[in-house]
Structures are given as structure tokens and as C-alpha cells.
């Protein structure tokens, strides 16, 4: 009989995996790198397109807002209003292009609501039809149906902030721009079949009956949840470009999101996507007279040229809301140029305590406002 030796050494365990600090600097540039303190999913993305580099700079970040619930009469906008500057640089010289050389006629910025980690959309919120209280609301990470978006769904990109090939805001590269949308049959309204109101809809691929346990949303939606989905972020979810001058007297291309509200409380981020929905070859199209032809709307797919996340902002309930943010110099500067931004008064009162100028209004907490422009 043979006996095992008790003093036999144990097998040497495998070495632990190397961290980013131990990797050599010669690794492939196609590997995404996560910066300390910045979630990889929440990083900005810029693209090189037709010899130009497009990027977004969220100059004025949203800080807080009061939740507006599921009614449509008590809208509470984010404060301060997000202001995003578009930066266009030459791909060869890396210098910013003069604004007079940029045609912003069809520049559009769209906005979505994301969770605080920047990992998933929370554009939809579900609430019970029988108990429409705020406590029954739950956010959903499922995106809205593709056939009700102003543009088709675009492909998400990850990796380095600057990529040579932009994602397409019309689907994958095989998308047929002439195929058109396929609307569901048998409904009175192709966008909202069988629904009484346009602000409420069922998730994609779901019949108009109550959601069952085998619905396309996954196993976590049970038959007991007969609620309906509605948008959590409401208001103007897209904005056109404006040529505005900042407080430093520098003109630029700006997008102002002054009409955004959130239905439920919590911590969120905004994701902004910049798209040029005009013809992409308008600079090369020449009329018989030798002058550039006027830009026209792009009937096909359009690439997402840049995207950016806002910082985390907080949405409070009515009891916990600390109040609106004081009007910033940037908001006042843009309001003076005609942008409809509600400006908080600085204690200037007229006769009998009334306002000396501007339209009178209150935000519900006794705060006086005046609407410029």
C-alpha cells in the first residue's frame, strides 16, 4: 500500500490578472479605456465626418427639478436649463471652424433620459391604471417604440471619444431609406393603435391588451402589472441650433433645452445626440449659376455626429424640493437675445409689490418669474 505524502507542496495558483496600471502602453487602440471616476457608458463621443470633427460641450448643467407627476398641468422644468455648445473643428488642422462657414439650418439635438450611472435609458415609466399615485411609478430601461420616434433608432457606439465612423441615426448600415416605416394594421392611428391618448402607449411588440407574463418585456413584468407606459422625460425633446453670443461676447452654435420635465423623483442624466438632418452633400451640390444649392431635408438615414451626457441631476418630490436655481448669467444672456427662458426675478418689485416688467408668474413655491423674449 502506498501512502500519500503529507508534505507534498500544493499547486501554485495562477497569477492574478493584470490591472490597467500594469499593462504596457503598446496595447491596441481599439480597446476601450475607462477613465477613473468617469463611467465608460457616460463618456462623450465625437466623430470625424466629411473632414470635420463634431463634439458637444454641456456648458450649463442641469442641477435639480421638482417632479411633475403624471398630470399635464403642473410642469416643472429642469433648472438651470441645459445649454449645449456645438464645436466643429477641422480634421486636419484641429482648429475650430468659423461659425460663418457652418450652415446650421438642419442641425438638431435630441435628448433622452438615462440613469445616474449612464448605462441604460429610463425614458419610460409605468404606473398602475387603478392606482395612479406617484408611489406606484417605476422607471423602465426599455426604449420607446421605433415607430413613434421623430427619427429611427440609432446604433450605440462605445470606445474612444473620437471615432472615424459615426453611428447611423437611421438604423444599421443596411437600412433601406426608401422602404419607409411599416405601420401596424387595423388601428385607427398608425402611431398609437387603439390608445385614447397620444402620451400613453404600450412597449414595442406588445398587444393593446394588458401585459401578460409572457410579454416581450421579459419575465420581470407579471400579469399583475396591468399599468401602461408613458414618457418619464416630457417637454421639448429636440432643439434646433441657434447662433448666440455668450457672456464673454463669443458667438457660437448653441442648443438650449429650456422645456424639459421629469415625472418621477430620482437621480438621472441627460444624453444629448447631435444630428444634421439636412443633405450631407449640400456643399458639393452646385446650382447652374455656380452658387451652392439650398439645403434640403434628408429623406434617408443621418449619422449621429456627436453625443454627450450631462452630469447627474436630482429630481425631488414636492415636499423635498429645495427650490429653483437662481437664473445664471448664461440664461439671462440668452433670454436677452430672444430665447424663451424663464428668468427668476431678483427682488425688483413695482407698485404695490407687483412686478415692474415682464409677464407675471409663479413656479408653485411662491417664486416670482418673468419670461423674457
Curated annotation (Swiss-Prot):
> Could you name the domain of life of the organism this protein comes from?
Eukaryota
Phenotypic effect of disruption: Leads to predominant production of large tuberculate spores with severe viability defects.
- Region described as Disordered: 1-26, 344-373
Reply yes or no: does the keyword Transcription apply.
yes
One GO term of the cellular component aspect?
nucleus
Question: What induces this protein's gene, according to its Swiss-Prot or TrEMBL record?
Answer: Expression is increased at higher temperature (37 degrees Celsius).
InterPro entries for the chain: Velvet, Velvet_dom, Velvet_dom_sf
Q: Which family does it belong to?
A: Belongs to the velvet family. VelB subfamily.
Its subunit composition reads:
Component of the heterotrimeric velvet complex composed of LAE1, VEL1 and VEL2; VEL1A acting as a bridging protein between LAE1 and VEL2. Forms a heterodimeric complex with VOS1; the formation of the VEL2-VOS1 complex is light-dependent.
What this protein is reported to do is described as:
Component of the velvet transcription factor complex that controls sexual/asexual developmental ratio in response to light, promoting sexual development in the darkness while stimulating asexual sporulation under illumination. The velvet complex acts as a global regulator for secondary metabolite gene expression. Component of the RYP2-RYP3 heterodimeric complex that plays a dual role in activating genes associated with spore maturation and repressing certain development-associated genes.
**Protein's name in the database:** Velvet complex subunit RYP3
Q: Origin organism of this chain? A: Ajellomyces capsulatus (Darling's disease fungus)
Amino acid at each position: 500500500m502506498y501512502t500519500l505524502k503529507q508534505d507534498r507542496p500544493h499547486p501554485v495558483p495562477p497569477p492574478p490578472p493584470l490591472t490597467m496600471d500594469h499593462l504596457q502602453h503598446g496595447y491596441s487602440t481599439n480597446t476601450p479605456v475607462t477613465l477613473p471616476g468617469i463611467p465608460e457608458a457616460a463618456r462623450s463621443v465625437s466623430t470625424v465626418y466629411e473632414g470635420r470633427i463634431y463634439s458637444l460641450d454641456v456648458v450649463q448643467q442641469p442641477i435639480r427639478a421638482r417632479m411633475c407627476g403624471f398630470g399635464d398641468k403642473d410642469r416643472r422644468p429642469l433648472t438651470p436649463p441645459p445649454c449645449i455648445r456645438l464645436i466643429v473643428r477641422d480634421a486636419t488642422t484641429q482648429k475650430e471652424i468659423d461659425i460663418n462657414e457652418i450652415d446650421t439650418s438642419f442641425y438638431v439635438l435630441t435628448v433622452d433620459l438615462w440613469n445616474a450611472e449612464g448605462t441604460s435609458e429610463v425614458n419610460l415609466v409605468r404606473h398602475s391604471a387603478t392606482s395612479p399615485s406617484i408611489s406606484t411609478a417605476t422607471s423602465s430601461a426599455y426604449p420607446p417604440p421605433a415607430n413613434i420616434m421623430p427619427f429611427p433608432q440609432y446604433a450605440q457606439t462605445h470606445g474612444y471619444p473620437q471615432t472615424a465612423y459615426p453611428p447611423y441615426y437611421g438604423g444599421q448600415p443596411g437600412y433601406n431609406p426608401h422602404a419607409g416605416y411599416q405601420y401596424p394594421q387595423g388601428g385607427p392611428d398608425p402611431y398609437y393603435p387603439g390608445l385614447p391618448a397620444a402620451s400613453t402607449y404600450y412597449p414595442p411588440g406588445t398587444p393593446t391588451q394588458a401585459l401578460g407574463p409572457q410579454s416581450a418585456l421579459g419575465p420581470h413584468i407579471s400579469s399583475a402589472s396591468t399599468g401602461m407606459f408613458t414618457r418619464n422625460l416630457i417637454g421639448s425633446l429636440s432643439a434646433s441650433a441657434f447662433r448666440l453670443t455668450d457672456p464673454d461676447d463669443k458667438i457660437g452654435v448653441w442648443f438650449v433645452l429650456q422645456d424639459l420635465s421629469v415625472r418621477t423623483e430620482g437621480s438621472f442624466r441627460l444624453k444629448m445626440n447631435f444630428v444634421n438632418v439636412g443633405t450631407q452633400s449640400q456643399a458639393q451640390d452646385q446650382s447652374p449659376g455656380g452658387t451652392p444649392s439650398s439645403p434640403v431635408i434628408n429623406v434617408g438615414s443621418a449619422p449621429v455626429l456627436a453625443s454627450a451626457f450631462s452630469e447627474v441631476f436630482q429630481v425631488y418630490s414636492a415636499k423635498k424640493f429645495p427650490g429653483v436655481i437662481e437664473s445664471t448669467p448664461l440664461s439671462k444672456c440668452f433670454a436677452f437675445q430672444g430665447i424663451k427662458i424663464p428668468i427668476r426675478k431678483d427682488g425688483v418689485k413695482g407698485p404695490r409689490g407687483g412686478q415692474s416688467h415682464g409677464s407675471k408668474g409663479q413656479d408653485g413655491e411662491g417664486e416670482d418669474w418673468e419670461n423674457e423674449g
